[in-house]
Amino acid sequence: MKVGVALSGGVDSAVALYLLLKEGHEVKAFHMKTKEDEFFLKKEIKKKVCCSPSDTADAIRIARSLGVEIEIVDVREVFREKVIEPFKRDLLRGLTPNPCVHCNRYVKFGYFMDYVLSQGFDAFASGHYARVEFSGKYGKKVIKKGVDGKKDQSYFLARIEPWRIEKLLFPNGIYTKEEIRRIAEEAGIHVAKKQESQDVCFIPDGSIENFLKDEGITLSEGKVITEKGEVVGHHRGYPLYTVGQRKGLKIEKFGERLYVREKIPESNVVVVSGLEGVFFSGLIAVDPVWHVDLPEEFRCVCRVRKKAEEAPAIVRVKNSEVEVRFEKKIFAVTPGQIAAFYDEDTLLGGAIIKEGIP
């Protein structure tokens, strides 16, 4: 089979490439450039991020060491249009967006995958910790969780278009991270011990405030109020806060621990409450993407953040809106984040959280 492999320059995609070669596939590596090299060089990078100049150099070295052709693909324009600009707009709307999910849908498993397949490849592969398997229950190929529960990345694939699943290969999904590193070492791949990417690639210093400043947006301080309207402190700019957050709030008076419950951009206000106020019995989500056919009402488990515990729920679908009711209240349902739905280890799809239901 002819397989185009997304090679980031990290150990995961390097091993995916290596495994596909061992299986006898005809492979070519493709590397995405999402930002100009100068962007990374002038930033104070606190943690390892993807798509940097050093990643490009590593990707080229990996491909050469394995005897594979590599092509650098410029996705900067579509990345800004589909990821950076919506991220910025959502922050100013008071949301907490997940740019990695949007990148996967529109760029990596969108524009980039389309480009690779247009070159005559039968499949598109990446180093994601997830699996693609045929489901007898749903009668088609589905995405399943990776066997390494700590590294499972299926959540970030919740909104890719369902037709693409037939064309996907995730060789790493049956391995743990430790096994992947061991395979890399045994194969002599030089990035076997390379640090994992941590922050959003276009915010390499981890600062939302600096990102907005670079985009020409100056934040204004505002009031922190309780649900009853009592002013208890001030914030540095509402886009810097998210539902459930406690640290970073300038609370000047109050007896109990307070958490962000809501942001009101129109009045530049952050609303806080006690812990009970940031637990929700359900949520409303919009713009769902379903990987399988489902009834209007079904039971499943729902994850509202990458590291959130999965919550059993009843889901009701009405056109482009999804109502989710949990068996018991969960912490910090955050507008802008993704609600991913699972049937055991099968990913059913995902939707964008509009609001939490108290």
Swiss-Prot record:
ATP binds at residues 6-13, 32, 127. InterPro entries: MnmA-like, MnmA-like_C, MnmA-like_central, MnmA-like_central_sf, Rossmann-like_a/b/a_fold. It catalyses: S-sulfanyl-L-cysteinyl-[protein] + uridine(34) in tRNA + AH2 + ATP = 2-thiouridine(34) in tRNA + L-cysteinyl-[protein] + A + AMP + diphosphate + H(+). The record marks 128, 337 as: Interaction with tRNA. It is found in: Cytoplasm. The active site is at residues 103, 201. One of its GO terms (biological process) is tRNA wobble position uridine thiolation. Its EC number is 2.8.1.13. Residues 151-153 are annotated as: Interaction with tRNA. Keywords: ATP-binding, Cytoplasm, Disulfide bond, Nucleotide-binding, RNA-binding, Transferase, tRNA processing, tRNA-binding. One of its GO terms (molecular function) is tRNA binding. Disulfide bonds join 103-201. GO terms for cellular component: cytoplasm. Gene3D superfamilies: Adenine nucleotide alpha hydrolases-like domains (2.30.30.280), HUPs (3.40.50.620), Translation factors (2.40.30.10). Pfam families: tRNA_Me_trans (PF03054), tRNA_Me_trans_C (PF20258), tRNA_Me_trans_M (PF20259). Catalyzes the 2-thiolation of uridine at the wobble position (U34) of tRNA, leading to the formation of s(2)U34. This is tRNA-specific 2-thiouridylase MnmA.
